[in-house]
């Protein structure tokens, strides 16, 4: 696997020198300063590429070229936003950058309720608490009909939890959910958030798939033409939330994408920390079935708790993800490609890491502190080395 590291650009608290010392050779980045929907110019792409290469690294993957909400709702200037997206792909290809990670999650990107969940060893992790999320949705956001998405027990627990929250607890929970986590392309006030949810009141799973199909049928032929590989990132968490449909959550969703636009440019990001939240997702089977279309991997683990919809981000080699079998399946896919004469490695990043050691004293981006990711990258690197030596050294 190609070892990569997500970098948020010149304002990132982790420097490119740090990235190189961590052992990564590739950088995963995006032009976050360009507004959603606008074209990424060749000039801006080359400027970022030069910064990365001057540090002795390569720009391996774009994560992400964001998709404007008008495209997801099929309203407003969606045709112009699609045309802009097509041009951005052409410009990236012209600059030699050919792997693009993206997602089709409506309104919210990845979502957590607690950004400082303290683990037994004193390090901090990200957590999604189903009961806290229910308390937010029913008692702070007050979304009409939200009760239908929860069990009677969850509704009672959420009311009890809300009753114990201080004003600061409520404000922190609201910020964590709607203000935008690292990599998220939108942040909202509570009123803005309600208005954006309202835009989806008539959009169910079938309609969102229909809108996604319009996007894929416009984008994938351009990607194929210019040699770009699109790698969709799964929903996080991989299930409907806030009354919003989610359509990249299961192996059935992956198959729907392939059936909708059967092109090798139409591929996947295997994010084990997202897909792995669902106990019914067999990650190794997903890799084996769709291996030729996996162009990027995020390798981390999560741990489901007593409520199976509550989870926290576990250490990379612990939790519910069998990292050994996952890495073995990815390495096997790389060797299958090699046998076909393809030498390209699959870019891998350790995704998130625990806030630990000296980083506990520093300001860090949630999930993106340096030392926790350094640890995760080293652990996954070790697993891969052992697999390569044990099975492919001859």
UniProtKB/Swiss-Prot annotation:
EC number from the UniProt entry: 4.2.1.8
Reaction(s) the record says it catalyses: D-mannonate = 2-dehydro-3-deoxy-D-gluconate + H2O
Coiled-coil stretches: none
Biological-process GO terms, alphabetical: D-glucuronate catabolic process
NCBIfam families per record: PRK03906.1 (NF003027), uxuA (TIGR00695)
UniProt GO MF annotations: ferrous iron binding; manganese ion binding; mannonate dehydratase activity
InterPro entries: Man_deHydtase (IPR004628), Xyl_isomerase-like_sf (IPR036237)
Cofactor(s) needed for function: Fe(2+); Mn(2+)
Function: Catalyzes the dehydration of D-mannonate.
Keyword tags: Iron, Lyase, Manganese
Pathway annotation: Carbohydrate metabolism; pentose and glucuronate interconversion
The organism's place on the tree of life at top rank: Bacteria
Protein name: Mannonate dehydratase
Organism: Shigella boydii serotype 4 (strain Sb227)
Family of the protein in this entry: Belongs to the mannonate dehydratase family.
Pfam families listed in its UniProt record: UxuA
HAMAP family noted in UniProt: UxuA
